[in-house]
From Swiss-Prot:
Topology relative to the membrane: Multi-pass membrane protein
The organism's place on the tree of life at top rank: Bacteria
Family that this chain belongs to: Belongs to the dicarboxylate/amino acid:cation symporter (DAACS) (TC 2.A.23) family.
Chief place where the protein resides: membrane
Subcellular location(s) of the protein: Cell inner membrane
InterPro entries: C4_dicarb_transport, Na-dicarboxylate_symporter, Na-dicarboxylate_symporter_CS, Na:dicarbo_symporter_sf
GO function terms (MF aspect): fumarate transmembrane transporter activity; malate:proton symporter activity; succinate transmembrane transporter activity
Record carries keyword Lyase: no
Protein's name in the database: C4-dicarboxylate transport protein
């Protein structure tokens, strides 16, 4: 039993996170030097994200009997994303207005260090809707894979899958090659995942070592408010959606616990993307649905990021005594409905979108970003965890709506009743 526990990726990552926190707190200089360990692990994951998405989407689409099903899946997914993301934005807006974590700070925007957030403000200038849409189209196929742009790879994979499907029996050889290549890629993922504890230790030690626990205390009310909001969203909103779909949100969270710990350690939901593709398929969702919903959700269904954006924007307004009446808040909501779709599931992207939103709204000081710059890294964990759970739930819901969900398999796996007597997980 003890040997099995020590070999568990769940236990190893949890232990690594605890060691990272202690190391960063008591030896901050050493903690800061651990950053390459976390960065290196995330880079290894990013290295195989593009081929994983390509293989999953191509084999999923090419293996379908009807192409109409693909279009229906995409339409249902986008509708679900828009509804749930809007709910997340509204919940964040309501709670930050009720709690008012920034009230009474009376910060003068002129005294804030605008240079500290200049890099985010500059990047935010390129976050327009037209620029976002054009960025989905790659300049070249090789460029899409080289940059690791999820939506660009997804677009090419969908087109490739359609074309391969039209070839019929002539394309069987190509289909078999891609399917075999997919198995090799997932073998690489299993090898990389053995390094997850090292990556989590390095990332957590760096975060605590660089920013310190004192930063948490200074703006603790906003952090606590945000974490509680994310928990309520997962339990109440996603929990209700899960119950209506026929499964327990708590059993689902238990099923993806290792992925959640990896995300907790790296602060990026992208680090768990390859494993989520595999685990959602093993949960009973058809490969074509998983291949479309999960990658697309990383830009269009970021529930945690949506909550963060409304809360952070209103917090800055409260702290700087900027006017934020109902008209301004509705304007903010409309802007965020568009700008939040440009936030990829990587560390720091939410901060860039927030800068773009403040610029678009106009009357909120962009320099106010300096107020939350130090604690943004601590809130990124809750964002990433909520995003991951949200995309997992979305996949099951969409699969059910388009009748591509194996309900018995879903129930068996979540209740540890797999036919082979094992839980459906990647090896650790």
């Amino acid at each position: 039993m003890k040997t099995s526990l020590f070999k568990s990726l769940y236990f190893q990552v949890l232990t690594a996170i605890a060691i990272g926190i202690l190391l960063g707190h008591f030896y901050p200089e050493i903690g800061e030097q651990m950053k390459p360990l976390g960065d290196g692990f995330v880079k290894l994951i990013k290295m195989i994200i593009a081929p994983v998405i390509f293989c999953t989407v191509v084999t999923g689409i090419a293996g379908m009997e009807s192409m109409k099903a693909v279009g229906r899946t995409g339409a249902v997914a986008l509708l679900y994303f828009e509804i749930v993301s809007t709910i997340a934005l509204i919940i964040g807006l309501i709670i930050v207005n009720v709690v008012q974590p920034g009230a009474g700070m009376n910060v003068d925007p002129a005294t804030l260090d605008a240079k500290a957030v200049a890099v985010y403000a500059d990047q935010a200038k390129d976050q327009g809707i037209v620029a976002f849409i054009m960025d989905v189209i790659p300049a070249s196929v090789i460029g899409a894979f080289a940059s690791g742009n999820i939506l660009q790879v997804l677009l090419f994979a969908v087109l490739f899958g359609f074309a391969l499907h039209r070839l019929g029996s002539k394309g069987q050889l190509i289909f078999n090659v891609i399917e075999s290549f997919s198995q090799v890629i997932f073998g690489i993922i299993n090898m990389i995942m053995r390094l997850a504890p090292i990556g989590a230790l390095g990332a957590m030690a760096f975060t605590i070592g660089k920013y310190g626990v004192g930063t948490l205390v200074q703006l603790g009310q906003l952090i606590i408010c945000f974490y509680i909001t994310c928990i309520l969203f997962v339990v109440l909103v996603l929990g209700s959606i899960a119950k209506a779909t026929g499964f327990s949100i708590f059993k689902f969270i238990r099923y993806i616990r290792e992925e959640l710990l990896i995300v907790l350690g790296t602060s990026s939901s992208e680090s768990a993307l390859p494993r989520m593709l595999d685990k959602m398929e093993k949960l009973g969702c058809r490969k074509s649905v998983v291949g479309l919903v999960i990658p697309t959700g990383y830009s269009f269904n970021l529930d945690g990021t949506s909550i963060y954006l409304t809360m952070a924007a209103v917090f800055i307004a409260q702290a700087t005594n900027s006017q934020m009446d109902i008209v301004h808040q509705i304007t903010l909501l409309i802007v965020l409905l568009l700008s939040s779709k440009g936030a990829a599931g990587v560390t720091g992207s939410g901060f860039i979108v927030l800068a773009a939103t403040l610029s678009a709204v106009g009357h909120l000081p962009v320099a106010g970003l300096a107020l939350i710059l130090g604690i943004d890294r601590f809130m990124s964990e809750a964002r990433a965890l909520t995003n991951l759970v949200g995309n997992g739930v979305a996949t099951i819901v969409v699969a059910k709506w388009v009748k591509e969900l194996d309900h018995k398999k879903l129930d068996d796996v979540l209740n540890n009743r797999a036919p082979d007597g094992k839980t459906h997980e990647l090896s650790s």
